[in-house]
Regions:
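Conserved catalytic core of nucleic-acid polymerases
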Residues: 227, 248, 280-283, 298, ...
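Short active-site loop/helix that positions an aromatic residue
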Residues: 38-41, 105-116, 128-132, 272-279, ...
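Nucleic-acid-processing active sites and adjacent nucleic-acid-binding tracks
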Residues: 63-99
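Conserved "right-hand" nucleotidyltransferase catalytic core of DNA-directed polymerases
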Residues: 1-74, 119, 136, 146-149, ...
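A common structural junction motif
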Residues: 475-476, 594-604
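Active-site palm subdomain of RNA-directed nucleic acid polymerases
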Residues: 203-213, 555-579
Length: 620
Protein backbone atom coordinates (compact mmCIF):
# COMPACT_ATOMS: atom_id res chain seq x y z
CA UNK A 1 0.00 0.00 0.00
CA UNK A 2 1.34 3.46 -0.87
CA UNK A 3 0.64 7.00 0.27
CA UNK A 4 0.91 10.45 -1.28
CA UNK A 5 3.54 13.11 -0.73
CA UNK A 6 1.57 14.74 2.08
CA UNK A 7 1.08 11.44 3.94
CA UNK A 8 -2.70 11.77 3.72
CA UNK A 9 -4.08 8.24 3.62
CA UNK A 10 -7.85 8.55 3.66
CA UNK A 11 -7.97 7.29 0.06
CA UNK A 12 -5.71 4.28 -0.51
CA UNK A 13 -4.49 2.36 -3.54
CA UNK A 14 -3.26 -1.18 -4.09
CA UNK A 15 -1.52 -0.33 -7.38
CA UNK A 16 2.24 -0.94 -7.58
CA UNK A 17 4.53 0.14 -10.39
CA UNK A 18 5.80 -2.64 -12.72
CA UNK A 19 9.08 -4.41 -12.10
CA UNK A 20 9.60 -5.89 -15.55
CA UNK A 21 10.43 -4.54 -19.01
CA UNK A 22 9.30 -7.29 -21.39
CA UNK A 23 10.55 -7.30 -24.96
CA UNK A 24 8.00 -6.26 -27.59
CA UNK A 25 9.94 -7.92 -30.41
CA UNK A 26 7.61 -9.78 -32.71
CA UNK A 27 4.54 -7.84 -31.57
CA UNK A 28 2.60 -6.42 -34.49
CA UNK A 29 0.95 -3.57 -32.60
CA UNK A 30 1.69 -1.73 -29.37
CA UNK A 31 -0.45 1.04 -27.85
CA UNK A 32 1.25 3.91 -26.03
CA UNK A 33 -0.13 6.72 -23.89
CA UNK A 34 1.54 9.49 -21.91
CA UNK A 35 0.63 11.34 -18.74
CA UNK A 36 2.04 14.85 -18.73
CA UNK A 37 2.48 18.04 -16.78
CA UNK A 38 1.18 20.44 -19.44
CA UNK A 39 0.13 23.50 -17.46
CA UNK A 40 -0.32 25.85 -20.43
CA UNK A 41 -2.32 23.41 -22.57
CA UNK A 42 -5.61 25.32 -22.36
CA UNK A 43 -4.12 28.79 -22.77
CA UNK A 44 -1.20 28.26 -25.17
CA UNK A 45 -1.76 24.85 -26.71
CA UNK A 46 0.40 21.75 -26.09
CA UNK A 47 3.67 22.75 -24.47
CA UNK A 48 5.99 20.20 -26.08
CA UNK A 49 7.24 22.36 -29.01
CA UNK A 50 8.05 25.21 -26.60
CA UNK A 51 9.61 22.83 -24.03
CA UNK A 52 7.08 23.96 -21.43
CA UNK A 53 6.00 21.06 -19.22
CA UNK A 54 7.15 17.46 -18.92
CA UNK A 55 6.24 13.79 -19.24
CA UNK A 56 5.41 12.26 -15.86
CA UNK A 57 4.77 8.70 -16.98
CA UNK A 58 4.35 6.37 -19.94
CA UNK A 59 1.91 3.49 -20.32
CA UNK A 60 2.23 0.71 -22.86
CA UNK A 61 0.02 -2.19 -23.90
CA UNK A 62 0.39 -5.12 -26.28
CA UNK A 63 -2.97 -6.56 -25.27
CA UNK A 64 -1.60 -9.35 -23.10
CA UNK A 65 0.78 -7.03 -21.23
CA UNK A 66 -0.05 -3.56 -19.91
CA UNK A 67 2.02 -1.36 -17.62
CA UNK A 68 2.43 2.24 -16.50
CA UNK A 69 5.97 3.49 -15.91
CA UNK A 70 5.92 6.64 -13.72
CA UNK A 71 9.04 8.82 -14.00
CA UNK A 72 8.29 12.35 -12.74
CA UNK A 73 5.33 12.46 -10.35
CA UNK A 74 5.88 15.29 -7.86
CA UNK A 75 3.96 13.21 -5.34
CA UNK A 76 6.46 10.36 -5.56
CA UNK A 77 6.36 6.71 -6.52
CA UNK A 78 8.64 7.08 -9.55
CA UNK A 79 10.82 4.48 -11.23
CA UNK A 80 14.41 4.81 -12.45
CA UNK A 81 13.96 7.30 -15.31
CA UNK A 82 16.97 6.10 -17.31
CA UNK A 83 15.79 2.48 -17.23
CA UNK A 84 12.26 3.42 -18.24
CA UNK A 85 13.31 5.70 -21.10
CA UNK A 86 15.79 3.15 -22.41
CA UNK A 87 13.01 0.58 -22.53
CA UNK A 88 10.39 2.89 -24.07
CA UNK A 89 12.94 4.10 -26.61
CA UNK A 90 13.67 0.51 -27.68
CA UNK A 91 9.96 -0.10 -28.27
CA UNK A 92 9.24 3.21 -30.02
CA UNK A 93 12.27 3.05 -32.31
CA UNK A 94 11.57 -0.52 -33.47
CA UNK A 95 10.11 0.17 -36.90
CA UNK A 96 8.71 -3.37 -37.20
CA UNK A 97 6.12 -2.56 -34.53
CA UNK A 98 3.04 -0.53 -35.44
CA UNK A 99 2.28 2.12 -32.81
CA UNK A 100 -1.23 3.12 -31.73
CA UNK A 101 -2.16 6.36 -29.96
CA UNK A 102 -5.33 8.25 -29.17
CA UNK A 103 -4.31 11.72 -30.42
CA UNK A 104 -0.90 10.75 -31.78
CA UNK A 105 0.28 14.32 -32.42
CA UNK A 106 0.23 15.03 -28.71
CA UNK A 107 2.00 11.90 -27.52
CA UNK A 108 4.71 11.67 -30.18
CA UNK A 109 5.34 15.37 -29.59
CA UNK A 110 6.00 14.83 -25.90
CA UNK A 111 8.06 11.69 -26.60
CA UNK A 112 10.30 13.82 -28.83
CA UNK A 113 11.16 15.99 -25.81
CA UNK A 114 12.64 12.83 -24.26
CA UNK A 115 14.75 12.26 -27.38
CA UNK A 116 12.52 9.36 -28.40
CA UNK A 117 11.59 9.04 -32.07
CA UNK A 118 8.51 6.97 -32.82
CA UNK A 119 9.28 4.77 -35.83
CA UNK A 120 7.08 2.32 -37.67
CA UNK A 121 3.52 2.80 -38.89
CA UNK A 122 1.49 5.24 -36.81
CA UNK A 123 -2.16 4.56 -35.99
CA UNK A 124 -4.51 6.99 -34.27
CA UNK A 125 -7.84 5.91 -32.80
CA UNK A 126 -8.90 9.56 -32.72
CA UNK A 127 -8.50 9.79 -36.50
CA UNK A 128 -10.34 6.51 -37.00
CA UNK A 129 -13.18 7.71 -34.76
CA UNK A 130 -13.56 10.93 -36.74
CA UNK A 131 -13.54 9.11 -40.09
CA UNK A 132 -16.26 6.78 -38.83
CA UNK A 133 -18.42 9.68 -37.67
CA UNK A 134 -17.39 13.30 -38.14
CA UNK A 135 -20.52 14.58 -36.36
CA UNK A 136 -19.89 13.26 -32.84
CA UNK A 137 -20.16 15.53 -29.82
CA UNK A 138 -17.11 13.97 -28.13
CA UNK A 139 -14.03 12.03 -29.25
CA UNK A 140 -12.43 11.29 -25.89
CA UNK A 141 -11.02 7.82 -25.33
CA UNK A 142 -13.74 7.19 -22.75
CA UNK A 143 -16.50 8.26 -25.15
CA UNK A 144 -15.20 6.05 -27.95
CA UNK A 145 -14.61 3.02 -25.73
CA UNK A 146 -18.05 3.40 -24.21
CA UNK A 147 -19.62 3.38 -27.69
CA UNK A 148 -17.56 0.65 -29.33
CA UNK A 149 -16.43 -1.55 -26.43
CA UNK A 150 -18.93 -0.93 -23.68
CA UNK A 151 -15.95 -0.16 -21.41
CA UNK A 152 -14.40 2.92 -19.90
CA UNK A 153 -11.64 3.89 -17.52
CA UNK A 154 -12.07 3.39 -13.79
CA UNK A 155 -11.27 6.84 -12.40
CA UNK A 156 -12.67 6.27 -8.90
CA UNK A 157 -9.36 6.16 -6.99
CA UNK A 158 -7.84 8.98 -9.04
CA UNK A 159 -10.81 11.31 -8.55
CA UNK A 160 -11.29 10.54 -4.87
CA UNK A 161 -7.62 11.12 -4.08
CA UNK A 162 -7.57 14.33 -6.12
CA UNK A 163 -10.63 15.58 -4.25
CA UNK A 164 -8.98 14.72 -0.92
CA UNK A 165 -5.94 16.79 -1.89
CA UNK A 166 -7.95 19.63 -3.39
CA UNK A 167 -6.54 18.94 -6.86
CA UNK A 168 -7.94 18.64 -10.37
CA UNK A 169 -7.78 14.94 -11.23
CA UNK A 170 -6.52 15.61 -14.78
CA UNK A 171 -4.69 18.94 -14.79
CA UNK A 172 -2.94 18.26 -11.45
CA UNK A 173 -2.23 14.58 -11.96
CA UNK A 174 1.51 15.28 -11.95
CA UNK A 175 1.28 16.42 -8.31
CA UNK A 176 -0.05 13.07 -7.13
CA UNK A 177 1.71 9.88 -6.07
CA UNK A 178 1.88 7.43 -8.98
CA UNK A 179 -0.10 4.78 -7.09
CA UNK A 180 -3.26 6.85 -7.49
CA UNK A 181 -2.67 7.35 -11.20
CA UNK A 182 -1.39 3.92 -12.21
CA UNK A 183 -4.69 2.11 -12.75
CA UNK A 184 -6.07 5.04 -14.77
CA UNK A 185 -2.91 5.34 -16.89
CA UNK A 186 -2.76 1.61 -17.63
CA UNK A 187 -6.36 1.75 -18.83
CA UNK A 188 -5.41 4.55 -21.24
CA UNK A 189 -3.02 2.22 -23.07
CA UNK A 190 -5.06 -0.99 -22.83
CA UNK A 191 -8.29 0.63 -23.99
CA UNK A 192 -6.47 2.36 -26.85
CA UNK A 193 -5.17 -1.06 -27.92
CA UNK A 194 -8.62 -2.68 -27.72
CA UNK A 195 -10.33 0.28 -29.38
CA UNK A 196 -7.86 0.15 -32.26
CA UNK A 197 -8.68 -3.51 -32.90
CA UNK A 198 -12.39 -2.75 -33.04
CA UNK A 199 -12.10 0.42 -35.12
CA UNK A 200 -9.98 -1.28 -37.78
CA UNK A 201 -12.88 -3.68 -38.34
CA UNK A 202 -15.24 -0.71 -38.69
CA UNK A 203 -12.85 1.14 -41.03
CA UNK A 204 -12.73 -1.89 -43.33
CA UNK A 205 -16.48 -2.39 -43.13
CA UNK A 206 -17.00 1.25 -44.16
CA UNK A 207 -14.39 1.01 -46.97
CA UNK A 208 -12.32 3.80 -45.42
CA UNK A 209 -8.92 2.06 -45.53
CA UNK A 210 -7.48 4.37 -48.19
CA UNK A 211 -8.34 7.68 -46.58
CA UNK A 212 -7.40 6.30 -43.13
CA UNK A 213 -3.97 5.31 -44.45
CA UNK A 214 -3.44 8.79 -45.90
CA UNK A 215 -4.45 10.45 -42.63
CA UNK A 216 -2.10 8.17 -40.66
CA UNK A 217 0.83 8.93 -42.97
CA UNK A 218 0.04 12.61 -42.52
CA UNK A 219 0.55 12.38 -38.74
CA UNK A 220 4.33 12.38 -39.12
CA UNK A 221 4.20 15.30 -41.58
CA UNK A 222 2.21 17.52 -39.23
CA UNK A 223 4.32 16.50 -36.23
CA UNK A 224 7.50 17.57 -38.04
CA UNK A 225 5.85 20.82 -39.18
CA UNK A 226 4.90 21.65 -35.60
CA UNK A 227 8.22 20.58 -34.10
CA UNK A 228 10.33 22.64 -36.50
CA UNK A 229 8.03 25.65 -36.51
CA UNK A 230 8.44 28.74 -38.68
CA UNK A 231 11.17 31.35 -38.33
CA UNK A 232 9.74 34.76 -37.40
CA UNK A 233 11.42 38.15 -37.96
CA UNK A 234 10.38 39.82 -34.69
CA UNK A 235 12.26 43.08 -35.35
CA UNK A 236 10.28 43.54 -38.53
CA UNK A 237 7.10 42.62 -36.65
CA UNK A 238 7.62 45.32 -34.01
CA UNK A 239 8.43 47.96 -36.65
CA UNK A 240 5.25 47.03 -38.50
CA UNK A 241 3.19 47.26 -35.31
CA UNK A 242 4.28 50.88 -34.85
CA UNK A 243 3.25 51.72 -38.42
CA UNK A 244 -0.13 50.06 -37.92
CA UNK A 245 -0.73 51.98 -34.68
CA UNK A 246 0.02 55.31 -36.35
CA UNK A 247 -2.28 54.51 -39.26
CA UNK A 248 -5.10 53.35 -36.98
CA UNK A 249 -4.89 56.52 -34.85
CA UNK A 250 -5.25 58.64 -38.00
CA UNK A 251 -8.47 56.82 -38.93
CA UNK A 252 -9.83 57.12 -35.37
CA UNK A 253 -9.07 60.87 -35.32
CA UNK A 254 -10.71 61.36 -38.71
CA UNK A 255 -13.83 59.50 -37.51
CA UNK A 256 -13.96 61.62 -34.36
CA UNK A 257 -13.66 64.81 -36.40
CA UNK A 258 -16.34 63.60 -38.78
CA UNK A 259 -18.88 62.41 -36.19
CA UNK A 260 -18.07 64.59 -33.19
CA UNK A 261 -17.36 61.68 -30.87
CA UNK A 262 -15.17 58.68 -30.11
CA UNK A 263 -15.85 55.47 -32.05
CA UNK A 264 -15.23 52.09 -30.44
CA UNK A 265 -14.39 49.94 -33.45
CA UNK A 266 -15.73 46.62 -32.21
CA UNK A 267 -18.88 47.92 -30.52
CA UNK A 268 -21.91 47.81 -32.82
CA UNK A 269 -23.68 50.26 -30.49
CA UNK A 270 -20.81 52.77 -30.69
CA UNK A 271 -20.62 52.47 -34.48
CA UNK A 272 -24.41 52.91 -34.64
CA UNK A 273 -24.16 56.09 -32.55
CA UNK A 274 -21.54 57.41 -34.97
CA UNK A 275 -23.85 56.64 -37.91
CA UNK A 276 -26.71 58.41 -36.12
CA UNK A 277 -24.60 61.53 -35.59
CA UNK A 278 -24.04 61.87 -39.34
CA UNK A 279 -27.58 60.74 -40.26
CA UNK A 280 -26.60 57.47 -41.96
CA UNK A 281 -29.00 54.54 -42.05
CA UNK A 282 -27.86 51.00 -41.20
CA UNK A 283 -29.42 47.51 -41.07
CA UNK A 284 -30.69 45.77 -37.95
CA UNK A 285 -30.99 42.18 -36.81
CA UNK A 286 -34.37 40.45 -36.46
CA UNK A 287 -34.35 41.50 -32.80
CA UNK A 288 -33.66 45.12 -33.71
CA UNK A 289 -29.98 45.38 -32.79
CA UNK A 290 -27.60 47.31 -35.10
CA UNK A 291 -25.96 45.04 -37.69
CA UNK A 292 -22.77 46.03 -39.49
CA UNK A 293 -21.61 43.27 -41.81
CA UNK A 294 -18.26 43.51 -43.52
CA UNK A 295 -19.97 43.65 -46.92
CA UNK A 296 -22.21 46.53 -45.80
CA UNK A 297 -19.29 48.56 -44.45
CA UNK A 298 -16.97 47.89 -47.39
CA UNK A 299 -19.50 48.70 -50.10
CA UNK A 300 -21.07 51.78 -48.50
CA UNK A 301 -20.51 55.00 -50.42
CA UNK A 302 -19.98 57.18 -47.35
CA UNK A 303 -16.51 57.75 -45.90
CA UNK A 304 -17.36 56.68 -42.32
CA UNK A 305 -18.17 52.98 -42.83
CA UNK A 306 -15.15 52.49 -45.05
CA UNK A 307 -12.92 54.03 -42.36
CA UNK A 308 -14.45 51.71 -39.74
CA UNK A 309 -13.52 48.74 -41.93
CA UNK A 310 -9.95 49.93 -42.51
CA UNK A 311 -9.38 50.78 -38.85
CA UNK A 312 -10.73 47.38 -37.79
CA UNK A 313 -8.33 45.62 -40.14
CA UNK A 314 -5.39 47.57 -38.71
CA UNK A 315 -6.51 46.87 -35.14
CA UNK A 316 -6.94 43.16 -35.80
CA UNK A 317 -3.56 42.91 -37.51
CA UNK A 318 -1.91 44.31 -34.38
CA UNK A 319 -3.83 42.26 -31.84
CA UNK A 320 -4.25 38.95 -33.62
CA UNK A 321 -1.31 38.74 -35.98
CA UNK A 322 1.51 40.58 -34.23
CA UNK A 323 0.79 40.53 -30.48
CA UNK A 324 -1.07 37.24 -30.96
CA UNK A 325 1.88 35.66 -32.72
CA UNK A 326 4.53 37.18 -30.45
CA UNK A 327 3.24 35.44 -27.32
CA UNK A 328 3.69 32.03 -28.95
CA UNK A 329 7.26 32.61 -30.14
CA UNK A 330 9.93 30.25 -28.79
CA UNK A 331 13.54 30.82 -29.86
CA UNK A 332 12.38 33.05 -32.75
CA UNK A 333 10.09 30.31 -34.07
CA UNK A 334 6.33 29.95 -34.16
CA UNK A 335 4.98 26.46 -33.47
CA UNK A 336 1.33 26.73 -34.48
CA UNK A 337 -0.81 23.65 -33.93
CA UNK A 338 -2.96 21.91 -36.52
CA UNK A 339 -6.25 20.09 -36.01
CA UNK A 340 -5.77 17.41 -38.63
CA UNK A 341 -9.32 16.13 -38.34
CA UNK A 342 -12.41 16.50 -36.17
CA UNK A 343 -11.69 16.05 -32.48
CA UNK A 344 -12.29 17.47 -29.02
CA UNK A 345 -9.89 20.38 -29.56
CA UNK A 346 -11.62 21.49 -32.77
CA UNK A 347 -11.20 20.47 -36.37
CA UNK A 348 -13.67 20.43 -39.24
CA UNK A 349 -16.32 17.97 -40.39
CA UNK A 350 -15.02 18.22 -43.98
CA UNK A 351 -11.47 17.01 -43.25
CA UNK A 352 -9.90 20.40 -43.88
CA UNK A 353 -7.32 21.64 -41.39
CA UNK A 354 -8.03 24.14 -38.67
CA UNK A 355 -5.28 25.83 -36.66
CA UNK A 356 -4.87 27.10 -33.12
CA UNK A 357 -2.26 28.61 -30.83
CA UNK A 358 -2.36 30.75 -32.95
CA UNK A 359 -4.95 30.47 -35.73
CA UNK A 360 -2.96 31.56 -38.77
CA UNK A 361 -5.86 30.76 -41.09
CA UNK A 362 -7.41 34.07 -40.06
CA UNK A 363 -4.56 35.89 -41.79
CA UNK A 364 -6.15 38.53 -44.08
CA UNK A 365 -5.65 37.77 -47.75
CA UNK A 366 -6.70 40.99 -49.44
CA UNK A 367 -5.22 43.74 -47.30
CA UNK A 368 -2.56 46.38 -47.79
CA UNK A 369 -0.91 45.39 -44.53
CA UNK A 370 -1.79 41.69 -44.66
CA UNK A 371 1.12 41.24 -47.05
CA UNK A 372 3.38 43.16 -44.67
CA UNK A 373 2.46 40.83 -41.79
CA UNK A 374 3.26 37.80 -43.95
CA UNK A 375 6.74 39.21 -44.56
CA UNK A 376 7.71 38.41 -40.97
CA UNK A 377 7.43 34.68 -41.84
CA UNK A 378 10.80 33.37 -43.03
CA UNK A 379 12.07 30.16 -44.66
CA UNK A 380 14.88 28.10 -43.15
CA UNK A 381 18.28 29.80 -43.04
CA UNK A 382 19.84 29.87 -46.51
CA UNK A 383 16.63 28.66 -48.18
CA UNK A 384 13.65 30.19 -49.98
CA UNK A 385 9.93 30.40 -49.27
CA UNK A 386 7.64 28.84 -51.84
CA UNK A 387 3.97 29.73 -51.80
CA UNK A 388 2.06 27.42 -54.14
CA UNK A 389 -1.65 28.03 -54.74
CA UNK A 390 -4.17 25.79 -56.42
CA UNK A 391 -5.86 27.91 -59.08
CA UNK A 392 -9.64 27.57 -58.70
CA UNK A 393 -9.31 24.29 -56.81
CA UNK A 394 -12.96 24.03 -55.82
CA UNK A 395 -14.45 24.88 -59.26
CA UNK A 396 -12.15 22.27 -60.82
CA UNK A 397 -13.33 19.66 -58.34
CA UNK A 398 -16.94 20.62 -59.02
CA UNK A 399 -16.36 20.22 -62.76
CA UNK A 400 -14.60 16.87 -62.17
CA UNK A 401 -17.67 15.47 -60.41
CA UNK A 402 -20.06 17.05 -62.92
CA UNK A 403 -18.25 15.25 -65.76
CA UNK A 404 -18.40 11.93 -63.91
CA UNK A 405 -22.10 12.58 -63.33
CA UNK A 406 -22.55 13.46 -67.03
CA UNK A 407 -24.15 16.82 -66.25
CA UNK A 408 -25.09 18.98 -69.23
CA UNK A 409 -22.56 21.73 -69.91
CA UNK A 410 -19.73 20.16 -67.89
CA UNK A 411 -17.71 19.20 -70.99
CA UNK A 412 -17.74 22.82 -72.13
CA UNK A 413 -16.25 23.93 -68.82
CA UNK A 414 -13.65 21.15 -68.96
CA UNK A 415 -12.56 22.39 -72.38
CA UNK A 416 -12.24 25.90 -70.96
CA UNK A 417 -9.97 24.59 -68.18
CA UNK A 418 -7.84 22.71 -70.72
CA UNK A 419 -7.44 25.94 -72.68
CA UNK A 420 -6.42 27.77 -69.51
CA UNK A 421 -9.56 29.91 -69.38
CA UNK A 422 -11.13 31.31 -66.23
CA UNK A 423 -13.97 29.28 -64.67
CA UNK A 424 -16.02 32.25 -63.51
CA UNK A 425 -15.69 33.97 -66.87
CA UNK A 426 -16.87 30.77 -68.53
CA UNK A 427 -19.98 30.57 -66.33
CA UNK A 428 -20.50 34.32 -66.86
CA UNK A 429 -20.52 33.76 -70.61
CA UNK A 430 -22.93 30.85 -70.24
CA UNK A 431 -25.29 32.93 -68.08
CA UNK A 432 -24.72 36.15 -70.05
CA UNK A 433 -23.92 38.17 -66.92
CA UNK A 434 -20.81 40.02 -65.64
CA UNK A 435 -18.02 37.87 -64.14
CA UNK A 436 -18.47 39.41 -60.67
CA UNK A 437 -22.09 38.28 -60.55
CA UNK A 438 -21.27 34.85 -61.97
CA UNK A 439 -18.60 34.30 -59.32
CA UNK A 440 -20.86 35.30 -56.42
CA UNK A 441 -23.79 33.22 -57.69
CA UNK A 442 -21.62 30.23 -58.64
CA UNK A 443 -19.88 30.12 -55.27
CA UNK A 444 -23.27 30.59 -53.63
CA UNK A 445 -24.58 27.49 -55.39
CA UNK A 446 -21.51 25.50 -54.30
CA UNK A 447 -21.79 26.67 -50.69
CA UNK A 448 -25.55 26.10 -50.43
CA UNK A 449 -26.25 29.83 -50.11
CA UNK A 450 -29.89 30.94 -50.22
CA UNK A 451 -31.19 33.82 -52.30
CA UNK A 452 -31.60 36.09 -49.23
CA UNK A 453 -27.91 35.89 -48.35
CA UNK A 454 -27.08 36.32 -52.03
CA UNK A 455 -29.20 39.48 -52.12
CA UNK A 456 -27.12 40.96 -49.30
CA UNK A 457 -23.84 40.03 -50.99
CA UNK A 458 -24.95 41.51 -54.32
CA UNK A 459 -26.72 44.52 -52.76
CA UNK A 460 -30.00 43.76 -54.55
CA UNK A 461 -33.52 42.89 -53.41
CA UNK A 462 -34.34 39.30 -52.39
CA UNK A 463 -36.77 38.97 -55.30
CA UNK A 464 -34.09 40.12 -57.76
CA UNK A 465 -31.65 37.61 -56.26
CA UNK A 466 -34.23 34.82 -56.49
CA UNK A 467 -34.89 35.54 -60.17
CA UNK A 468 -31.18 35.85 -60.95
CA UNK A 469 -30.42 32.55 -59.21
CA UNK A 470 -33.21 30.79 -61.12
CA UNK A 471 -31.92 32.12 -64.45
CA UNK A 472 -28.33 31.12 -63.58
CA UNK A 473 -29.38 27.56 -62.79
CA UNK A 474 -31.09 27.26 -66.15
CA UNK A 475 -28.19 28.66 -68.18
CA UNK A 476 -25.43 26.92 -66.20
CA UNK A 477 -27.08 23.49 -65.89
CA UNK A 478 -24.06 21.45 -64.78
CA UNK A 479 -23.96 23.27 -61.42
CA UNK A 480 -27.66 22.77 -60.75
CA UNK A 481 -27.35 19.17 -61.92
CA UNK A 482 -24.58 18.47 -59.43
CA UNK A 483 -26.41 20.26 -56.64
CA UNK A 484 -29.53 18.15 -57.17
CA UNK A 485 -27.62 14.88 -57.64
CA UNK A 486 -25.62 15.27 -54.43
CA UNK A 487 -28.62 16.46 -52.41
CA UNK A 488 -30.67 13.52 -53.65
CA UNK A 489 -27.91 11.11 -52.69
CA UNK A 490 -27.63 12.66 -49.22
CA UNK A 491 -31.41 12.54 -48.73
CA UNK A 492 -31.78 8.95 -49.91
CA UNK A 493 -28.87 7.18 -48.20
CA UNK A 494 -27.61 9.77 -45.71
CA UNK A 495 -24.00 9.76 -46.93
CA UNK A 496 -21.83 10.98 -49.78
CA UNK A 497 -18.16 10.21 -50.49
CA UNK A 498 -15.37 12.59 -51.40
CA UNK A 499 -12.59 12.24 -53.95
CA UNK A 500 -10.64 9.68 -51.89
CA UNK A 501 -13.63 8.02 -50.23
CA UNK A 502 -14.03 10.14 -47.10
CA UNK A 503 -17.62 9.83 -45.88
CA UNK A 504 -19.83 12.85 -45.23
CA UNK A 505 -22.84 11.90 -43.13
CA UNK A 506 -26.26 13.47 -42.84
CA UNK A 507 -27.67 11.60 -39.88
CA UNK A 508 -29.72 14.31 -38.18
CA UNK A 509 -33.36 15.15 -38.89
CA UNK A 510 -35.61 18.22 -38.81
CA UNK A 511 -39.31 18.98 -39.48
CA UNK A 512 -40.45 18.46 -43.04
CA UNK A 513 -41.97 21.93 -43.09
CA UNK A 514 -40.76 25.52 -42.80
CA UNK A 515 -42.00 28.49 -40.79
CA UNK A 516 -40.32 31.90 -41.29
CA UNK A 517 -38.17 33.18 -38.41
CA UNK A 518 -38.58 29.95 -36.45
CA UNK A 519 -35.65 27.73 -35.47
CA UNK A 520 -36.00 23.96 -35.25
CA UNK A 521 -33.28 21.90 -33.64
CA UNK A 522 -32.06 18.93 -35.70
CA UNK A 523 -32.08 15.59 -33.86
CA UNK A 524 -31.43 11.85 -34.34
CA UNK A 525 -34.25 10.13 -36.26
CA UNK A 526 -36.27 8.60 -33.41
CA UNK A 527 -36.03 11.72 -31.28
CA UNK A 528 -36.99 13.96 -34.22
CA UNK A 529 -39.99 11.77 -35.13
CA UNK A 530 -41.21 11.92 -31.54
CA UNK A 531 -40.79 15.70 -31.48
CA UNK A 532 -41.93 16.71 -34.97
CA UNK A 533 -43.71 13.74 -36.56
CA UNK A 534 -43.05 14.27 -40.26
CA UNK A 535 -39.29 14.74 -40.70
CA UNK A 536 -36.55 14.99 -43.32
CA UNK A 537 -32.76 14.78 -43.21
CA UNK A 538 -31.19 18.01 -41.98
CA UNK A 539 -28.52 20.01 -43.77
CA UNK A 540 -28.61 18.23 -47.12
CA UNK A 541 -28.59 21.60 -48.89
CA UNK A 542 -24.94 21.71 -47.81
CA UNK A 543 -24.16 18.36 -49.43
CA UNK A 544 -22.46 19.80 -52.53
CA UNK A 545 -20.32 22.07 -50.37
CA UNK A 546 -19.37 19.11 -48.15
CA UNK A 547 -18.40 17.12 -51.24
CA UNK A 548 -16.22 19.91 -52.65
CA UNK A 549 -14.63 20.92 -49.33
CA UNK A 550 -13.96 17.31 -48.36
CA UNK A 551 -12.43 16.56 -51.75
CA UNK A 552 -10.24 19.67 -51.52
CA UNK A 553 -9.07 18.36 -48.14
CA UNK A 554 -8.27 14.98 -49.73
CA UNK A 555 -6.25 16.58 -52.52
CA UNK A 556 -4.35 18.92 -50.20
CA UNK A 557 -3.53 16.21 -47.66
CA UNK A 558 -2.38 13.82 -50.38
CA UNK A 559 -0.07 16.57 -51.67
CA UNK A 560 1.46 17.10 -48.23
CA UNK A 561 2.15 13.39 -47.81
CA UNK A 562 3.69 13.15 -51.30
CA UNK A 563 5.85 16.26 -50.87
CA UNK A 564 7.14 14.86 -47.57
CA UNK A 565 7.67 11.26 -48.71
CA UNK A 566 8.85 11.84 -52.28
CA UNK A 567 10.81 15.09 -51.95
CA UNK A 568 11.82 14.92 -48.29
CA UNK A 569 10.33 18.39 -47.77
CA UNK A 570 8.38 19.17 -44.61
CA UNK A 571 5.80 21.89 -45.36
CA UNK A 572 5.91 25.09 -43.34
CA UNK A 573 2.25 25.95 -43.46
CA UNK A 574 -0.97 24.96 -45.21
CA UNK A 575 -3.78 27.48 -45.58
CA UNK A 576 -6.96 27.15 -47.62
CA UNK A 577 -5.76 26.16 -51.13
CA UNK A 578 -2.16 27.21 -50.50
CA UNK A 579 0.89 25.14 -49.52
CA UNK A 580 4.00 26.85 -48.17
CA UNK A 581 7.42 25.18 -47.97
CA UNK A 582 11.06 26.04 -47.42
CA UNK A 583 13.09 24.98 -50.47
CA UNK A 584 16.74 25.08 -51.43
CA UNK A 585 16.23 26.08 -55.07
CA UNK A 586 13.79 27.02 -57.82
CA UNK A 587 13.97 23.40 -58.98
CA UNK A 588 12.62 22.17 -55.65
CA UNK A 589 9.85 24.73 -55.99
CA UNK A 590 9.01 23.35 -59.43
CA UNK A 591 9.03 19.82 -57.98
CA UNK A 592 6.46 20.88 -55.37
CA UNK A 593 4.29 22.39 -58.11
CA UNK A 594 4.54 19.21 -60.18
CA UNK A 595 3.41 17.02 -57.28
CA UNK A 596 0.50 19.35 -56.51
CA UNK A 597 -0.74 19.22 -60.08
CA UNK A 598 -0.41 15.45 -60.47
CA UNK A 599 -1.01 13.87 -57.04
CA UNK A 600 -4.59 12.92 -57.99
CA UNK A 601 -5.82 12.46 -61.54
CA UNK A 602 -8.93 14.56 -62.18
CA UNK A 603 -11.21 14.85 -65.19
CA UNK A 604 -9.89 18.42 -65.55
CA UNK A 605 -6.27 19.58 -65.23
CA UNK A 606 -5.15 20.93 -61.85
CA UNK A 607 -3.25 24.19 -62.09
CA UNK A 608 -0.82 25.56 -59.51
CA UNK A 609 0.66 29.05 -59.42
CA UNK A 610 3.74 29.56 -57.28
CA UNK A 611 6.52 31.95 -56.36
CA UNK A 612 9.89 31.30 -54.73
CA UNK A 613 11.00 34.32 -52.66
CA UNK A 614 12.76 35.34 -49.45
CA UNK A 615 9.63 35.42 -47.23
CA UNK A 616 5.94 34.58 -47.26
CA UNK A 617 4.78 38.10 -48.07
CA UNK A 618 6.93 38.39 -51.17
CA UNK A 619 6.02 34.86 -52.30
CA UNK A 620 2.27 35.40 -51.99
Amino acid sequence: MTYDLFNQNIVKSEWLHPTEFPSMKGRKVVAIDLETCDTTLKTMGPGWPRKVGSVIGISISSGDFTAYYPIAHQGGGNMDEKKVLKYIKSVCEDDSIQKVFHNAQYDIGWLSTLDIEVKGYLHDTLIASALLNENRYAYTLNAMCSEYLGEWKNEKVLKEKAEELGLDSKADMYKMHSSFVGEYAEADALLTYKLHERLMVEIEKDALEGVYDMECRLIRVIFNMTKRGIRIDMMRAMDLKQKLQIKEKKYLKRMKDLTGGEVQLWSARSVADAFDRVNLEYPHTVLGAPSFTQTFLETHKHELPRMVTKARVLNKLQGTFIDGIAKYIHNDRLHAHVNQIRGDSGGTVTGRFSMYAPNLQQMPIRSEFGSEVRKIFLPEQGEYWISADYSQQEPRLLTHFAILNKNAGADKVREAFIQGLDFHQQTADMADIPRRLAKTIGLGVMYGMGYKKMAVDLDITPMEAKAMLKEFRIKVPFMQGMLEAVMNRANQVGTIRTLLGRKCRFDMYEPNWYEPNKFYKSMPLKQAEAEYGNVKRAGTYKALNRLIQGSAADQTKKVMVDVYEKLGITPLLQMHDELNCSVKSDKEGADVKNIMENCIKLEVPSKVEYKVKDNWGNAK
